[in-house]
Amino acid sequence: MTRRIGFTPRARSQFLAAVEYMHAERPMAARAFRNRSMEALRNLIRFPESGRVIPEFPDLGFREVLVGKYRFFYRLQGDAVWVVGVWHDAQIPDEPA
């Protein structure tokens, strides 16, 4: 059973940048996005394979969960879900590492 969520440094930076960007214009929307994101990630603790395989990188073993217009790329490792990237859906994502 998966018991925790972790962020790589890059993913944490991307997530915080998205929240800060929203907060500058709409603080309430930023707070709601942060809360929805954390809820979606917590759901992965119970259902770690519920995210879809990333269409751009189907052979790499990464999955994604969508929150609004943002894509959270993650991988399963031991008892953890590791978020490896956070992208707006208008961005072309880098290959997860």
Task: Show the residue positions of the predicted features.
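Basic, Lys/Arg-enriched alpha-helical interface segments
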Residues: 1-62, 80, 94-96
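Enriched for short, Lys/Arg-rich terminal
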Residues: 67-97
